[in-house]
């Protein structure tokens, strides 16, 4: 018998169906020589100090090191944190399945986290059987069948596991040590300081405080209106005035002028290529911008669409497609373009020469998110919105460039320079799909066709006006901005950022106010406690991902990486210890 382990029941059942393992048992499927079982996510974790008998932590015990054993996932109950009974029961079922089989196939997520989940499970249950890896990027019948026909040796992914395990141990080192230390220093118990969670909360709070403390300032803009061919063109003075009297002086000068002179006319055309296909971060940003869906909603929805075989693996950081994946897309596009709403674009798509920024080797765990071409069937409103974004972006990538003409006109009026910038679309190309012209507008310039002007030409001034401009406070973070900030700052990965937001919500550090993410009183109190500390600084661990990538490539060892992390932990706990000393020795 061959055992197959997945990390979700739905995925396990789908693989079992394709393989003919159609007999349902408690916690697994069996048949046709296979036993397919599953975990409920990651059911194992590194042990905590209390699990190894450490009842009380003293300053001399720092830095704390992770015990060498794993424990079953704990959940909060009325009696405190206890082992998850559902995880315990499923682990017994998995052990039964694995003990009954000669070979084990790891069918967990084809990613760092999925690899670590299987390796930890394999070690925890003390398995000895040979193991193979199923590595697929979609759950279509074809992908599963092809993957099973080309199983890979597990040792090929040793470096991937080392990277995941290193990240897991580093998170434990920094999170547990800083949490225990801050609790001991300032009595801030029942709270955790995660290496990503804390700087993200600090940034949300910093921006919230900046908004609270904001003082508005006024400036004044002067506009002149020119008239040609019965068309009014409004131009703005190139500088804003901080004092009204200077704006008023220029306004008076312009009112006294009958004609302005065209100083320069610049027209340029540009072919703008379609955006690359989505990764999860870009999809979360667009779904929040256009449909007000949260990052958590988008991750959950895409996982559901993946399990329904409608899209490829969603938790990817890549926006690239390898050549072999690209070669499958004409057949996928044929299915899409047969749909009524997309039939008009059939003649516009071109698969003959893949764009260089689309077809590439060396993607991360998975290629960009694309549709599989399977009929979507019945989807709820939110699923349909996300699916349409992915579908449209997949189609956009293989349509012609959009041609845009940008025009800048400079005018001299009352010896001062005024300017206007506009654009117009000459050929829509990929812009035909969603029509989102803000993607091509430079600096928010308007779309407008201007009359023909020539340098030196006098043009009648039809009016002028002054506009007061008041600075506005920065808005709290939206999910679009927050995941973008985390991405730019190197905080977390595409597959972990959503869980960081989820954790902050569950621990009541943050909440939603409409579309904005704002801190709670508890979150602000926590922020005031750690503000200025290294543990709240994004730079503390922003280089981790680059080092983890080097471990994955075999260029850095786990010992070297964790040695550097341990030095960071000593800095963090040392800083907290100094706070403790100052508190007790005022």
Task: State each model region's role.
Residues 185-192, 203-247, 290, 429-431:
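C-terminal helical "lid" subdomain and adjoining coupling/linker elements of P-loop NTPases
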Residues 1-3, 108-110, 187-190, 267-276, ...:
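Conserved short loop/turn motifs at secondary-structure junctions
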Residues 2, 25, 80-82, 87, ...:
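Basic, low-complexity terminal or inter-domain segments flanking catalytic cores
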Residues 49, 100-105, 232-247, 251, ...:
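OB-fold/S1-family RNA-binding modules
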Residues 1-168, 172-174, 465:
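Intrinsically disordered, low-complexity regulatory segments
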Residues 242-278, 284:
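Metal- or metallocofactor-binding catalytic centers and their adjacent structured scaffolds
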Residues 197:
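Conserved PLP-enzyme active-site core in the AAT-like
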């Amino acid at each position: 018998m061959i055992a197959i382990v997945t990390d979700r029941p739905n995925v396990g059942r789908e693989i079992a169906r394709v393989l003919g393992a159609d007999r349902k048992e408690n916690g697994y499927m069996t048949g046709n020589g296979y036993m397919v079982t599953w975990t409920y996510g990651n059911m194992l974790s590194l042990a905590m100090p209390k699990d190894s008998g450490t009842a009380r932590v003293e300053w001399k015990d720092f830095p704390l090191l992770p015990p060498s054993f794993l424990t079953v996932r704990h959940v909060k109950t009325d009696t405190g944190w206890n082992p998850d009974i559902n995880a315990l029961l499923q682990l017994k079922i998995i052990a039964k399945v694995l003990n009954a089989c000669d070979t084990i196939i790891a069918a967990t997520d084809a990613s760092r986290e999925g690899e670590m989940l299987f390796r930890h499970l394999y070690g925890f249950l003390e398995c000895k059987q040979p193991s193979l890896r199923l590595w697929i990027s979609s759950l279509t019948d074809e992908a599963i069948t092809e993957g099973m026909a080309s199983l890979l040796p597990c040792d090929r992914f040793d470096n991937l596991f080392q990277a995941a395990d290193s990240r897991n141990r580093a998170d434990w080192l920094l999170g547990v040590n800083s949490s225990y230390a801050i609790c001991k220093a300032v009595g801030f118990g029942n709270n955790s300081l995660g290496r990503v969670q804390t700087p993200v909360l600090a940034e949300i709070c910093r921006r919230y405080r900046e908004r609270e403390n904001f003082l508005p300032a006024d400036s004044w803009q002067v506009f002149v209106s020119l008239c040609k061919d019965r068309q009014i063109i409004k131009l703005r003075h190139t500088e804003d005035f901080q004092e009204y009297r200077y704006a008023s002086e220029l306004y008076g000068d312009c009112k006294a002028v009958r004609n302005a002179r065209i100083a320069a006319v610049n027209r340029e055309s540009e072919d703008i290529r379609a955006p690359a296909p989505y990764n999860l971060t870009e999809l979360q940003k667009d779904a929040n911008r256009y449909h007000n869906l949260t990052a958590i909603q988008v991750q959950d929805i895409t996982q559901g669409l993946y399990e329904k075989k409608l899209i490829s693996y969603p938790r990817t950081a890549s926006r690239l497609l390898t050549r072999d994946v690209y070669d499958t897309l004409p057949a996928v596009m044929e299915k899409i373009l047969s749909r009524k709403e997309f039939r008009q674009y059939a003649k516009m798509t071109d698969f003959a020469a893949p764009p260089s920024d689309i077809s590439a080797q060396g993607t991360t765990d998975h290629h960009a998110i694309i549709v599989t071409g399977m009929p979507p069937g019945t989807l709820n409103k939110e699923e349909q919105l996300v699916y349409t974004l992915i579908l449209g972006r997949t189609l956009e990538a293989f349509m012609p460039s959009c041609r845009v003409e940008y025009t800048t006109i400079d005018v001299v009026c009352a010896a001062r320079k005024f300017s206007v910038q506009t654009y117009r679309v000459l050929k829509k190309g990929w812009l035909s799909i969603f029509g989102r012209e803000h993607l091509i507008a430079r600096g928010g310039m308007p779309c407008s066709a201007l009359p023909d002007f020539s340098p030196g030409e006098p043009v009648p001034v039809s009016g002028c006006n002054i506009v007061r401009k008041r600075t506005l406070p920065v808005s709290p973070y939206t999910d679009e901005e927050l995941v973008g900030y985390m991405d730019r700052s190197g905080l977390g990965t595409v597959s972990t950022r959503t869980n960081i937001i989820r954790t902050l919500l569950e621990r009541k550090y943050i909440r939603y106010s409409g579309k904005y993410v704002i801190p709670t009183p508890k979150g602000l109190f926590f922020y005031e406690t750690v503000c200025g500390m290294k543990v709240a600084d994004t730079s503390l661990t922003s280089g981790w991902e680059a080092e983890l990538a080097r471990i994955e490539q075999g260029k850095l060892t786990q010992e070297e990486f964790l040695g550097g992390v341990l030095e960071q932990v000593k800095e963090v706990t040392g800083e907290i210890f100094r706070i403790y000393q100052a508190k007790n020795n005022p």
